[in-house]
């Protein structure tokens, strides 16, 4: 019987709530069904939205009155619908100023308006410094020797150790946790508009295979740094536990904002209970203290991510 519920709707664009309202429910008896029209304003919002925007409609049913088991306003069911899926756009990397470039046998340094970035031209081509307005962004713990680092390994979980331990065993046999990393080249060029292009290529060597990583940095005078990464597997490799690059940032950046599923952690096989939206939390809270250590803090369908010191 729908008479005991209120039906609320919200429309979000790119993770931000833009409109909301309530739908009057008809008297539908148990076991029966009826089609309920949506407000016309939803179609109007879709028509006026950018074709690249992400639109989500969330329908929620809440109790009208107190019940023995819950108070009025308690949500008993919800569902989210994708009205228009947002498009990923290529960055418009237009430079409007000049950059200073310094290079010697050991370092490549580039600086602009209030920022500087430096690479070490050693065996790995690691980033050694990234500062904005005098504040260092990167951290350099002893167990994180270079940045960015190609990561194709993670600690095995219970699932990886099941079925005869085959996944974790393969990773160990191929030495996925201990690659030998070398630098092929680190070079730069200056575009006609003054932007600096830095190309870095590294190799992660494992027992019988390797992963070649190509980094393409585009650096603008306002401090924008666009990084595109390409991975090329070669030789014999096991099923990879993961693949990506990792940076280690200063602990000052403790606030985590993302557009994607949340706010709780979610995974490919457990994500429909997490709505797509614009969420905010602390970095420390993303870790879940399970009785046995497992994956935690994962977020699915993330379109953008911000870390801030505020």
Task: Say what each PLM segment does.
Residues 39-52, 65-67, 80-310:
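Beta-strand/loop-rich accessory regions of lumenal/periplasmic or secreted enzymes
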Residues 5-7, 245-246:
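Aromatic-lined ligand-binding clefts that engage carbohydrates, nucleic acids, or primary amines
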Residues 18-20, 71-78, 83, 137:
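Local beta-strand/beta-hairpin segments that build beta-sheet-rich folds
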Residues 1-5, 236-239:
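A short beta-turn/strand-edge loop motif at beta-sheet boundaries
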Residues 7-71:
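Intrinsically disordered, low-complexity Pro/Gly/Ser/Thr-rich segments with frequent PxxP/GP/PP motifs
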């Amino acid at each position: 019987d729908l008479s005991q519920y209120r039906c609320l709707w919200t429309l979000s664009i790119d993770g931000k709530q833009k409109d909301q309202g309530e739908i009057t429910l008809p008297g539908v008896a148990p076991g029966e069904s009826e089609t309920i029209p949506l407000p016309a304003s939803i179609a109007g919002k879709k028509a006026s939205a950018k074709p690249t925007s992400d639109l989500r409609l969330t329908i929620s049913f809440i109790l009208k009155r107190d019940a023995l088991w819950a108070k009025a306003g308690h949500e008993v069911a919800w569902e989210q619908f994708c009205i228009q899926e947002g498009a990923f756009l290529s960055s418009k990397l237009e430079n409007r100023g000049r950059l200073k470039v310094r290079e010697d046998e050991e370092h490549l340094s580039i600086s602009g308006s209030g920022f500087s970035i430096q690479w070490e031209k050693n065996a790995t081509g690691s980033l050694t410094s990234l500062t904005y307005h005098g504040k260092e962004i990167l951290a350099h713990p002893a167990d994180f020797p270079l940045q960015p680092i190609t990561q194709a390994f993670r600690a095995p979980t219970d699932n990886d150790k099941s079925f005869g331990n085959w996944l974790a065993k393969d990773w160990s046999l191929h030495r996925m946790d201990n690659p030998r990393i070398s630098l092929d080249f680190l070079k730069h060029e200056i575009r006609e508009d003054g932007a600096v292009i830095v190309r870095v290529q590294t190799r992660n060597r494992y027992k019988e295979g390797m992963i070649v990583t190509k980094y393409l940095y585009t650096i603008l005078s306002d401090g924008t740094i666009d990084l595109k990464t390409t991975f090329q597997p070669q030789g014999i490799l096991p099923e990879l536990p993961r693949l990506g690059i990792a940076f280690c940032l200063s602990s000052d950046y403790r606030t985590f904002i993302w557009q994607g599923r949340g706010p709780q952690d979610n995974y490919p096989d457990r994500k429909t209970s997490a709505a797509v939206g614009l969420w905010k939390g602390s970095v420390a809270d993303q870790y879940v203290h399970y009785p046995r250590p497992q994956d935690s803090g994962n977020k699915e369908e993330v379109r953008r991510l911000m870390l801030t010191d505020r």
